[in-house]
Amino acid sequence: MADKHKHVDEVSGVETTGHEWDGIRELNNPMPRWWVYSFYATIIWAIGYAIAYPSWPMLTEATKGMLGYSSRAEVSVELAAAKAAQAGNLEQIASSSVEEIIANPQLQQFAVSAGASAFKVNCAQCHGSGAAGGQGFPNLNDDDWLWGGKPQEIYQTIAHGVRHAPDGETRVSEMPPFGDMLTPELMQQTAAYVVSLTQAPSQPHLVQQGKQVFADNCASCHGADAKGNREMGAPNLADAIWLKGEGEQAVITQMKTPKHGVMPAWLPRLGDDTVKQLAVFVHSLGGGE
């Protein structure tokens, strides 16, 4: 009975599938033989693959396959080979100071490459992928160093961090809040003077008064010339590099309620070798001393 209702296309003489969409019918042509054979071939290939390689998940592991192949075992072999190739350089790094590593061209090249990888994983989240930093996070490409840019000084900062309380050798500096010590007028004068060191202030007539306020309250840390003090971690205010924000209002805000960043001590987390590699990498960025 069903054959009596089959529709045949008048032009091609081929039966249709019997369905119609907005007057459009589909010819019931058989699939090309090459397509059918290809389809069967993929089925055979899949069955062969499932037999030869690990494929079917079990309760504790997958079937091992007739070839006994394991991608994890292959990766383990490659990792072991890579570690063996690096062993010589790593041994030299372990027994050398940061300065000695930099003095050895081959070892420096290895340390810079390894340090760059460690930087991307552990440091780029704050300092940026290009180490250019951001507001509150120092730019590591320039030569504006709070604690010094010599190899061992960089190592010390990375190893023990900044204001990382659990580490007894961490870098520590703290600017007191001047909001309770100075009037708004005095802070405005000081901000005018600080800004005048690198650009034109909005109120030039306050600069001389601010210079005196600075000498009385700020020079003990930042220096009489406002160029900072690395022993105390006091930043240079006479350059055009601003860590917490630029302009008089940013200076006033930092004076009134100072913000102090925290950098973790990386030595316990990464180990001495990796910290040395990071120090060599940061030193190589262009601002190292």
UniProtKB/Swiss-Prot annotation:
Family note: Belongs to the CcoP / FixP family.
PANTHER family: CBB3-TYPE CYTOCHROME C OXIDASE SUBUNIT FIXP
UniProt topology in membrane: Single-pass membrane protein
Cofactor(s) in the UniProt record: heme c
Annotated InterPro entries: CcoP_N, CcoP_N_sf, Cyt_c-like_dom, Cyt_c-like_dom_sf, Cyt_C_IC, Cyt_c_oxidase_cbb3_su3, Cytochrome_c_Oxidase_Subunit
Pfam families referenced in this protein's UniProt entry, alphabetically: Cytochrome_CBB3, FixP_N
Gene: fixP
GO MF entry, a single one: heme binding
Location(s), subcellular: Cell inner membrane
Cofactor binding summary note: Binds 2 heme C groups per subunit.
Key words, A-Z: Cell inner membrane, Cell membrane, Electron transport, Heme, Hydrogen ion transport, Ion transport, Iron, Membrane, Metal-binding, Oxidoreductase, Plasmid, Repeat, Respiratory chain, Transmembrane, Transmembrane helix, Transport
Residues covered by the Cytochrome c domain: 110-198, 205-286
Assembly and oligomerization: Component of the cbb3-type cytochrome c oxidase at least composed of FixN, FixO, FixQ and FixP.
A GO CC term assigned to this protein in UniProt: plasma membrane
The name this protein goes by in its record: Cbb3-type cytochrome c oxidase subunit FixP
Binding site for heme c 2: 175, 218, 221-222
Pathway(s) annotated for this protein in UniProt: Energy metabolism; oxidative phosphorylation
Transmembrane segments: 34-56
Ranges per topology, Periplasmic: 57-289
Biological function: C-type cytochrome. Part of the cbb3-type cytochrome c oxidase complex. FixP subunit is required for transferring electrons from donor cytochrome c via its heme groups to FixO subunit. From there, electrons are shuttled to the catalytic binuclear center of FixN subunit where oxygen reduction takes place. The complex also functions as a proton pump.
Cytoplasmic topological intervals: 1-33
Residues the record lists as binding heme c 1: 123, 126-127, 263
Signal peptide: none
GO annotation, biological process: oxidative phosphorylation; proton transmembrane transport
